[in-house]
């Protein structure tokens, strides 16, 4: 069975150029500069003995940054003084020194907790019996209306229980809906 060629043979002309000097005009020498870390092409005259007499081009220079001018105010200590103070205060041999001036509590404001825990009232037949009307948060009927209003939502859950406006004022509408229902002779169902 004869072997078949799968592709054309590569031509010898597309080879990369050899890295060593050739005898034509100028020699191309590739080397890597340590500081610039990039591949450079150096042209040398034909017959140069070695790379020892190579002079680095003038455009490749190490960066030089001018010293930063001092912009701090006269009263600000320098970073050296700050670092020395920090090092002396954080040395391992001595314990940390207490603050120079302890914080004094202000006497004008009484000490109160920032967050008060929520109070839970268990559901009962009269949820607002011991609460003054200013803290009830219930909807008040407009002046001239004689109907019993439904208070705002209570922690109790369950079905709505509404009574007509003719019964005792101790009965209340227990509901979870918000905002309070519109005024009328009875609560909406």
Curated annotation (Swiss-Prot):
Question: Where are the compositionally biased (Basic residues) regions?
Answer: 1-16
Q: What is this protein called?
A: Protein Rex
Lineage in the entry?
Viruses, Riboviria, Pararnavirae, Artverviricota, Revtraviricetes
What do we know about how this protein assembles, alone or with others? Homomultimer. Multimeric assembly is essential for activity and involves XPO1. Binds to human XPO1 and KPNB1. Interacts (via N-terminal nuclear localization signal) with human NPM1.
Q: Where is this region: Disordered?
A: 1-26, 87-189
Q: Where is this region: Homomultimerization?
A: 56-70, 123-131
Q: Which UniProt keywords apply?
A: Host cytoplasm, Host nucleus, Host-virus interaction, mRNA transport, Phosphoprotein, RNA-binding, Transport
Question: Tell me, what is an example of a GO biological process annotation in this record?
Answer: mRNA transport
Q: Where is this motif: Nuclear localization signal, and RNA-binding (RxRE)?
A: 2-18
Coiled coil, from the record: none
Domain note:
The RNA-binding motif binds to the RxRE, a complex secondary structure consisting of four stem loops and a long stretch of stem structure, present in incompletely spliced viral pre-mRNAs. This region also contains the NLS which mediates nuclear localization. These overlapping functions prevent Rex bound to RxRE from undesirable return to the nucleus. When Rex binds the RxRE, the NLS becomes masked while the NES remains accessible. The leucine-rich NES mediates binding to human XPO1.
Species = Human T-cell leukemia virus 1 (isolate Melanesia mel5 subtype C) (HTLV-1)
Alphabetized GO MF terms? RNA binding
Describe the task this protein carries out.
Rex escorts unspliced gag-pro-pol and singly spliced env mRNAs out of the nucleus of infected cells. These mRNAs carry a recognition sequence called Rex responsive element (RxRE or XRE) located at the 3' region of the long terminal repeat (LTR). This function is essential since most HTLV proteins are translated from unspliced or partially spliced pre-mRNAs that cannot exit the nucleus by the pathway used by fully processed cellular mRNAs. Rex itself is translated from a fully spliced mRNA that probably readily exits the nucleus.
Instruction: Tell me where in this chain the PTM Phosphoserine is found.
Output: 70, 177
- Which family is it part of? Belongs to the deltaretrovirus Rex protein family.
Q: How is it modified after translation?
A: Phosphorylated.
């Amino acid at each position: 069975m004869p072997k078949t060629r799968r592709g054309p043979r590569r031509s010898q002309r597309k080879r990369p150029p050899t890295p060593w000097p050739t005898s034509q005009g100028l020699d191309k020498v590739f080397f890597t500069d340590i500081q610039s870390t990039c591949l450079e092409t150096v042209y040398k005259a034909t017959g140069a003995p070695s790379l020892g007499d190579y002079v680095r081009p003038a455009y490749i220079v190490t960066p030089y940054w001018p010293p930063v001018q001092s912009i701090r105010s006269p009263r600000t200590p320098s970073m050296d003084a700050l670092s020395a103070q920090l090092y002396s205060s954080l040395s391992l041999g001595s314990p940390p020194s207490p603050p120079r001036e302890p914080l004094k509590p202000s006497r004008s404001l009484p000490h109160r907790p920032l967050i008060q825990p929520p109070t839970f009232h268990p559901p009962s037949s009269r949820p607002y019996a011991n609460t003054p009307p200013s803290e009830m948060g219930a909807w008040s009927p407009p002046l001239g209306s004689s109907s019993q209003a439904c208070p705002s939502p209570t922690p109790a859950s369950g079905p709505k229980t509404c009574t007509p406006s003719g019964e005792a004022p101790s009965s209340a509408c227990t509901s979870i809906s918000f905002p309070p229902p519109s005024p009328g002779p009875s609560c909406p169902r």
